[in-house]
Every structure is written in structure tokens, then in C-alpha cells.
Amino acid sequence: MSENIPLRVQFKRMKAAEWARSDVILLESEIGFETDTGFARAGDGHNRFSDLGYISPLDYNLLTNKPNIDGLATKVETAQKLQQKADKETVYTKAESKQELDKKLNLKGGVMTGQLKFKPAATVAYSSSTGGAVNIDLSSTRGAGVVVYSDNDTSDGPLMSLRTGKETFNQSALFVDYKGTTNAVNIAMRHATTPNFSSALNITSGNENGSAMQLRGSEKALGTLKITHENPSIGADYDKNAARYPLILSKRQNGAGTAAQGIYINSTSGTTGKLLRIRNLSDDKFYVKSDGGFYAKETSQIDGNLKLKDPTANDHAATKAYVDKAISELKKLILKK
């Protein structure tokens, strides 16, 4: 005659931090509880508590003949409960549970084949400090907020992708609100072992009624846009074909041509500064003053190498007013003699 021997389940209780330091190996009939989080792990007779996977309500029911499981990781919900991944790591599906996760939710083990998706309600705040479907407050730490890293040789997608599919969308894809002591945005493209034709920043716009990039600065003694070219080699002539500011005007593919202007300089309110200034070794070589005059030095106006077809034309850089003034000064000198 066979005899049914009921399974006896032993419980051990410690705080999560104590379990992490513990070398206790739970037997197959033992369950360890984290008293401060409510998590539970079932022993296997071989591994430490921290090496075991958390048990789900289903596992717990089978082990304990379905007792009240309200004391587990989160309160039992009618339609949404703890789900169990294949690697035995718990995944929460109900944010309203507000479960304290001891500063970290560790999703590890196995191969992740799914996605972690958020579909917020319409009431999510848009504040740049307290809003967002995902909000990370780093006020109490000096670490990075989000780190996306890959060690793959190739990839089918970017490390981060931002997209909107609606033409009526009226907000930026990326917004940076910064008040600090370093650069608001840093892009560092490392030197490749084999140089390739790629850029640290590539901006392409198909909007013909807007600029591809707009810059607005309020500098006292610096340029709104500063471009520095550095020779990648110690050889003086290595970069002889490089340019700090190349400007290319191109026609559309299969188009007839282009009539775009190369460099357009304008001051809508008027400026008394030089409109164009070219230097080498910190010495002025050529500049155009606010009145349109061409100069090589402060007092040496260009004459020999600049040929004017119509020096008295009103629409020429050497304006009629300028020529008239120069002739007047010349007449004064002649009369003195």
C-alpha cells in the first residue's frame, strides 16, 4: 500500500542586502524571502540565493498549495500579475503597484527576444524636468542617465532613433535645455584605424522653405560659428588639398543647373565692422570694410590687382560715392601744388 508524504516547505527570511552577502545555499524544499522587498526565490540545493531566479505567483502556488500571495513582490491584481520570463527574471506589467525595487531592477540572463514598450496616457506631463513617459532623476547620483553601448561589428539600426510620421507634428524631435559650464552637446568621432568617408555630424534637409541649420549667438569677442581645421599628420603638406570651409553649390540630379549664391553676407540693421576679413599668421591680408571698400592693409587700398570694368557704377563694390570722394581728395592735392 502506497503512502502519500506531503512536501514540507521551509522559509528563510532576510533583507535583500543580507541575502546578497549570504553564502547560504537553499535546499529544494526551501524558499527564501526578501523581507524588505517581498521577493522570493526557491532553492535548488546548489546555488546561493542571489544566483537563483525570483519565483512567480504560479511557482509559489504550486509549492505552497495556493496560500494568500498578497505578500509577494506586488499586490495581486485582477487582470495583471507578475509575469515570468524564460530566464526566471520577473517583469512588472502594472506601474500602479509602485513596488520598491531596492534602487535597481535587474533584467539579466538569457537572450531577450521581446521589447520593453511604454504607451503613456494623454495625461503625461511635458515638463523638461518632471514630465515624460520615462523620467530619470539624477539629482542624487553623478552617473550617466542613459547609456546605449554596442560592441557589434555591424548593425541593422542606429543606437538611438527618433522619428515622427506626421507632417503636422509641432515639437522638436530632440530638445536640450542646458545651463552648465561645458558644451551643451558633445560629439566625439574617434580616429579610425582605416580612415573612411564619414562625418561626425551629418545634417540633411529636404525642406525648401527652411534652412538646413540655423545658428544664433550672442558673443562678445568670439565667432557665432568657429571652425578649426587640424592637420591629421605631422607633415606640413599632408593636408594641402583640405579646406576649412569648403562650399559646394550643386544642381539637382538630372537638373539643368543652379543659380544659388555662394557666400551671402548681410547686416539688416547695419554694421560698422568689416564685412569680410582674411588673415594669415594673425596678419590681415585682405578685408572688405562696411562701406564696401577693398583693403589689403589698414591704409593700403587695393589698386593694381583689382580691375574694375566700371569704377563709377552704383552697384559695384567700389561705389560711385567712394570714387567721387577719392577724386575730390586728389583734386585738393593738385591745387596745393
From Swiss-Prot:
GO cellular component annotations of the record: virion component
SUPFAM superfamilies named among the record's database cross-references: Phage fibre proteins
Highest taxon of source: Viruses
Any one GO biological process: symbiont entry into host cell via disruption of host cell envelope
MF terms in GO: hyalurononglucosaminidase activity
Pfam families: Hyaluronidase_1 (PF07212), Mtd_N (PF18454)
UniProt-listed Enzyme Commission number(s): 3.2.1.35
Top EC group: hydrolase
Catalysed reactions listed for this entry: Random hydrolysis of (1->4)-linkages between N-acetyl-beta-D-glucosamine and D-glucuronate residues in hyaluronate
Coiled coil: none
Role of this protein: The hyaluronidase of this bacteriophage mediates the penetration of the hyaluronic capsule of Streptococcus pyogenes.
Family: Belongs to the glycosyl hydrolase 69 family.
Name of the protein this chain belongs to: Hyaluronoglucosaminidase
Organism: Streptococcus pyogenes phage H10403
